[in-house]
């Protein structure tokens, strides 16, 4: 079972209710006669989302967890990193959005021309609005998996809700094996597509009505069949939140290894 949990604080990660001085007074100091390397190995077993708990043990634990070396070196060398899906969700216009992460447990829009840099020739190339690439490519409902660009198209223009762009042929094709019968009723402008450990994840609102507060999560595994045809297999469909305020919009959804 998966659920969407809010991360305390503002979008920049600060916790306005956190007072380190009060924490020091509330927690008794503990003297640990352990090498720092051993402490790192012990704490590395804790998932990143639970790091606030070990921090409260003592100052030594806090220093280890807050160090860049711990998360970027120690956890990677010990193969304890894992993908975590984060989403930035806004609830009303002109209000500050909040960060959420997916945990396993019981302004007016303007059109802008997209420019891309070709590193071999060292040239800038403009992708016009009428180009085939721009047909389904949207920043929120698109993502890259295995060097291929995938997009969510709930209008099913190619008869399937997920499409993939083949750069060598400059053409979009449907992801076979996934159709609307496998998905909940989703609202396109409230749904996002993300790469989660090599799989596609759709995170989206249940419908387009203002009274809807549900967020669905659909996990889809990808595989190649019959040459280069991409197929999808729906692994799970679940409601990850029922408690969000109405009229929420998912502004960003990305996976981070922690």
Curated annotation (Swiss-Prot):
Residues 28-74 form the F-box domain. Pfam families: F-box (PF00646), Kelch_FKB95 (PF25210). Residues 8-20 have a biased composition (Low complexity). Residues 1-25 are annotated as: Disordered. This is Probable F-box protein At2g29610.
């Amino acid at each position: 079972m998966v659920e969407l949990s809010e991360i305390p604080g503002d979008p920049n990660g600060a916790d306005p209710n956190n007072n380190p001085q009060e924490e020091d007074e509330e927690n008794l100091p503990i003297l640990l006669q352990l090498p720092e390397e051993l402490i790192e190995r012990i704490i590395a077993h804790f998932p990143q989302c639970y790091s606030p708990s070990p921090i409260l043990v003592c100052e030594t634990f806090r220093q280890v967890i807050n160090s860049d070396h711990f998360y970027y070196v120690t956890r990677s060398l010990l193969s304890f990193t894992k993908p975590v899906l984060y989403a930035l969700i806004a609830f009303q216009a002109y209000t500050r959005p909040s960060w959420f992460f997916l945990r396993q447990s019981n302004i007016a829009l303007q059109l802008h021309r997209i420019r891309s840099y070709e590193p071999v020739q060292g040239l800038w190339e403009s992708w016009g609005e009428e180009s085939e690439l721009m047909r389904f490519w949207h920043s929120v409902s698109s993502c890259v998996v295995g060097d291929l660009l995938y997009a969510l198209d709930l209008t099913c223009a190619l008869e399937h809700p997920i499409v993939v762009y083949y750069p060598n042929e400059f053409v979009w094709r449907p992801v076979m094996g996934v159709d609307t019968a496998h998905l909940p009723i989703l609202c396109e402008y409230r749904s996002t597509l993300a790469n989660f450990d090599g799989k596609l994840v759709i995170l989206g609102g249940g419908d387009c009505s203002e009274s809807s507060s549900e967020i669905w999560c659909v996990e889809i595994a990808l595989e190649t069949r019959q040459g280069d045809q991409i197929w999808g297999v729906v692994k799970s469909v679940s409601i990850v939140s029922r408690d969000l305020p109405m009229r929420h919009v998912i502004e960003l959804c990305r996976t981070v290894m922690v």
